[in-house]
Amino acid sequence: MSPQTETKASVGFKAGVKDYKLTYYTPEYETKDTDILAAFRVTPQPGVPPEEAGAAVAAESSTGTWTTVWTDGLTSLDRYKGRCYGIEPVPGEENQYIAYVAYPLDLFEEGSVTNMFTSIVGNVFGFKALRALRLEDLRIPTAYVKTFQGPPHGIQVERDKLNKYGRPLLGCTIKPKLGLSAKNYGRAVYECLRGGLDFTKDDENVNSQPFMRWRDRFLFCAEAIFKSQAETGEIKGHYLNATAGTCEEMMKRAIFARELGVPIVMHDYLTGGFTANTSLAHYCRDNGLLLHIHRAMHAVIDRQKNHGIHFRVLAKALRMSGGDHIHSGTVVGKLEGEREITLGFVDLLRDDFIEKDRSRGIYFTQDWVSLPGVLPVASGGIHVWHMPALTEIFGDDSVLQFGGGTLGHPWGNAPGAVANRVALEACVQARNEGRDLATEGNEIIREATKWSPELAAACEVWKEIKFEFQAMDTLDQ
């Protein structure tokens, strides 16, 4: 027998399988300021106690495996293991629990969202002892936050670059999203920007297809930007989607955008991946480009209430990885978004310090220690009648993005942009005069139609359009 084996045997290594809760369920644990804290919604399999399920999550997302291994004796489990330090039943739900887990900071690579997610939501979501598992929230300690660059520029720097203050920014996604030639696409961009929008946008699946290669699109859109800037005297932008099949190709497109002198590029951060996104964010900061983030694929991850990852976690991860804008739902349009939940993660995107508030789904107090903020983007099924509600819900630090609500105007793209700009300016002026947008919104829009035939035509077209469906993701009662 070797000396190493003798030593291990002498301290009583005992092979076999132990209940996770014997090692990883520690209700007496006092969390540290440096711990990453997680709130999981756990649905155990029948017969599995909630404490065992919570401990299993802590174990499988940190140092544990299914059996005792002799190499446990070569390190300090007490220093490195995750700990389930609290379990509470979910009100109104049968056999669902919130399990609180604390992870020591040394488990994570600095400045890597990829590594953080690989650890916390890696294998554990396929664990057989759990019927379902959802990561509801994370508390990122300030010590870890400071290892991230975060958004390339942030809200204030973006306003300074654009010279636009005191109102939400206006955008438009060019439609049809697929099929236009580069020249016709650029024409649509020009008409929208000339009409009064601040931004236009590539749709998330516009990359470099046979009908419109990326270089051609970039060139025609740059021409549209500069022509509309010269005519209006305002700084304009188009979110040029740099997302590509490889990181190298993505960077090539971002470099070309910078050489053209445009102000902003775009990335699909979930399909593109956090590693690619962080690399692009670093390039954008170093080269003066704003970065718009689309959340394509998010609903695959966050739509189900009992399994997946809540979008507030994906939003926090984006702020760490880097992005100046991110789509965040509308509350009033065609896409998912319950009001209090949406406002909760909008605050997590914009503010420096956010208090724990379970009424808005915020499980932990989060201190971003001056990490730049991200502008939430409201888009999806919105039109001029929604403008008062959007202005009231999202406030000035937001981007309101009307695709069909601009391009669907009966008179064309430029009049559609005029209608949206007039509606926004009317709402901002009314709010600044002390009027209540929530109760007087429709009246404010009707008054503005007297001075804008474009707005009057838009109001007539969309007066009956509503998307009245119950949100899937609601607060626990």
From Swiss-Prot:
EC number assigned by the record: 4.1.1.39
PTM summary: The disulfide bond which can form in the large chain dimeric partners within the hexadecamer appears to be associated with oxidative stress and protein turnover.
Annotated positions of the N-acetylproline modification: P3
UniProt cofactor(s): Mg(2+)
Residue numbers bearing the N6-carboxylysine modification: K201
Subcellular location: Plastid, Chloroplast
Binding-site residues, substrate: N123, T173, K177, R295, H327, S379
Cofactor: record remark: Binds 1 Mg(2+) ion per subunit.
CDD domains noted in UniProt: RuBisCO_large_I (cd08212)
GO biological process, one term: reductive pentose-phosphate cycle
Swiss-Prot/TrEMBL keywords: Acetylation, Calvin cycle, Carbon dioxide fixation, Chloroplast, Disulfide bond, Lyase, Magnesium, Metal-binding, Methylation, Monooxygenase, Oxidoreductase, Photorespiration, Photosynthesis, Plastid
GO cellular component terms, semicolon-separated: chloroplast
Main location: plastid
Keyword Protease carried by entry: no
Any one GO MF annotation of this record: ribulose-bisphosphate carboxylase activity
Positions carrying N6,N6,N6-trimethyllysine: K14
Record: active site: K175, H294
Signal peptide extent: none
Subunit structure, as described in the record: Heterohexadecamer of 8 large chains and 8 small chains; disulfide-linked. The disulfide link is formed within the large subunit homodimers.
Family: Belongs to the RuBisCO large chain family. Type I subfamily.
Cited function: RuBisCO catalyzes two reactions: the carboxylation of D-ribulose 1,5-bisphosphate, the primary event in carbon dioxide fixation, as well as the oxidative fragmentation of the pentose substrate in the photorespiration process. Both reactions occur simultaneously and in competition at the same active site.
Additional detail: The basic functional RuBisCO is composed of a large chain homodimer in a 'head-to-tail' conformation. In form I RuBisCO this homodimer is arranged in a barrel-like tetramer with the small subunits forming a tetrameric 'cap' on each end of the 'barrel'.
Official protein name in the record: Ribulose bisphosphate carboxylase large chain
Gene: rbcL
